[in-house]
Swiss-Prot record:
Protein name: ATP synthase subunit beta, chloroplastic
Taxonomy, superkingdom: Eukaryota
PROSITE patterns for the chain: ATPASE_ALPHA_BETA (PS00152)
Keyword Translocase carried by entry: yes
Subcellular location(s) of the protein: Plastid, Chloroplast thylakoid membrane
Family: Belongs to the ATPase alpha/beta chains family.
Organism of derivation: Aethionema cordifolium (Lebanon stonecress)
Lineage: Eukaryota, Viridiplantae, Streptophyta, Embryophyta, Tracheophyta
Record PTM Phosphoserine, positions in chain: 13
Length: 490
């Protein structure tokens, strides 16, 4: 982190005494730049291409050095579109890595990968900036306290609870509800949490980014009248951006979150949607950088790139970063190298199932595939642990019996198995829940269910006290009292 002299614009910089090079080759988002002997930039240095295109419009493209090629050439990846660039254009070596604004000035604003505001609300105070490339905190700085982060979502809190200061992954294929779930978590946690949040939109739909911004303004998480009182900073590098921007926008968001943790000593929430696009952007430029592709065409540096990002997301003795990341699963294949590499870094995984989404059970969280390192009796307590295990056993038995039911029907099952199936179907429906952010689609008001209420509800179903109620009564309700009230109206 460094303190800069006041400027009115993050793009303003003194270009004297900088090394000057020229573009030698352009292949899509990748540029080769020739520098004079002895004036070579370092890896990760920012380069700025300045000039005019054929229409006389001003060009200002920032790139990041990735490779030193020999013959006084470097290979760099552009952070914005390279249309209008041509060979021979002047390139300025800024002498430092990309740096972005950090601190209270970022709250309530939307930034691009370079830390420039894109919300038409004027310039940002850039006196305090920080480079996007840093080392992870040292081992002795890490904090190892274990505590649960309550989300108000029944299936998550009961079966795969989140760790405060941990890393959580939401895994799912296309269209099963990752972004809706992340928006609900922002709604439930960011409001109740009271601290600051940073949202990194990595290679997702621009419309969803706009929806999220509007939602945050309506809910007061962003205070338009007094931006300093806002609780969130937004960093977007969406689908239409070049791969360089999508590859680095996650680091920009993380750098802003690290400042709140290390300097302001706060607990921070970091939302990333979608971490797969970070990997995808890396694979897009990897071949252009001359690297041999690895498994399924991914970059050979996949584990290194993921590790350098994920290891910085951690809790220190000063403050914590709790990170919730959506992970797109290509073709619903969890063994694909991108989701498989991400798994290794997470404390809890919430796996979304297309089968449950097809049944209309939302959130479509798979209760048997989702896991958490926090689900241990010494952390969550005996009652929570036992209830969660019984719920999983009941659902597992139901899954085993489904083939028999499909061939022979329910009547061929033993009395005990029929009871298990009936309770499992009630549990499956009770794991659904109306969301605040989906009210406009469903027409049902959203529900926040506390952990104690969640455990009480599932214990009642498992005990058999509610065996007489129809299973429809448990569908899309909050706590168990709502289910019993709904049953009287059916």
């Amino acid at each position: 982190m460094r303190i800069n002299p006041t400027t009115s614009d993050p793009g303003v910089s003194i270009l004297e005494n900088k090394n000057l090079g020229r573009i030698a080759q352009i292949i899509g988002p990748v540029l080769d730049v020739a520098f004079p002997p002895g004036k070579m930039p370092n890896i990760y240095n920012a380069l700025v291409v300045k000039g005019r295109d054929t229409l006389g419009q001003e060009i200002n493209v920032t790139c990041e050095v990735q490779q030193l090629l020999g013959n006084n050439r470097v290979r760099a990846v552009a952070m914005s579109a390279t249309e209008g660039l041509k060979r021979g254009m002047d390139v300025v070596d800024m002498g430092t890595p990309l740096s972005v604004p950090v601190g209270g000035a970022t709250l309530g604003r939307i930034f691009n990968v370079l830390g420039e505001p894109v919300d038409n609300l004027g310039p940002v105070d850039t006196r305090t900036t920080s480079p996007i490339h840093k080392s992870a905190p040292a081992f002795i700085q890490l904090d190892t306290k274990l505590s649960i982060f309550e989300t108000g979502i029944k299936v998550v809190d009961l079966l795969a609870p989140y760790r405060r200061g941990g890393k959580i992954g939401l895994f799912g294929g296309a269209g099963v509800g990752k972004t809706v779930l992340i928006m609900e978590l922002i709604n439930n946690i960011a409001k109740a949490h009271g601290g600051v949040s940073v949202f990194g939109g990595v290679g997702e739909r621009t419309r969803e980014g706009n929806d999220l911004y509007m939602e945050m303004k309506e809910s007061g998480v962003i205070n338009e009248q007094n931006l300093a009182e806002s609780k969130v900073a937004l960093v977007y590098g969406q689908m239409n951006e070049p791969p360089g921007a999508r590859m680095r926008v996650g680091l920009t968001a993380l750098t802003m979150a690290e400042y709140f943790r290390d300097v302001n000593e706060q607990d921070v929430l970091l939302f990333i949607d979608n971490i797969f696009r970070f990997v995808q952007a890396g694979s897009e430029v990897s071949a252009l950088l001359g690297r041999m592709p690895s498994a399924v065409g991914y970059q050979p540096t996949l584990s290194t790139e993921m590790g350098s990002l994920q290891e910085r997301i951690t809790s220190t003795k000063k403050g914590s970063i709790t990170s919730i990341q959506a992970v797109y699963v290509p073709a619903d294949d969890l063994t694909d190298p991108a989701p498989a590499t991400t798994f290794a870094h997470l404390d809890a995984t919430t796996v979304l199932s297309r089968g449950l989404a097809a049944k209309g059970i939302y959130p479509a969280v798979d209760p048997l595939d989702s896991t958490s390192t926090m689900l241990q009796p010494r952390i969550v307590g005996e009652e929570h642990y036992e209830t969660a295990q019984q719920v999983k056993q009941t659902l597992q038995r139901y899954k085993e019996l489904q083939d028999i039911i499909a061939i022979l029907g329910l009547d061929e099952l033993s009395e005990e198995d029929r009871l298990t199936v009936a309770r499992a179907r009630k549990i499956e429906r009770f794991l659904s829940q109306p969301f605040f952010v989906a009210e406009v689609f469903t027409g049902s008001p959203g529900k926040y269910v506390g952990l104690a209420e969640t455990i009480r509800g599932f214990k009642l179903i498992l005990s058999g006290e509610l065996d007489s109620l129809p299973e429809q009564a448990f569908y899309l309700v909050g706590n168990i009292d709502e289910a019993t009230a709904k049953a009287t109206n059916l």
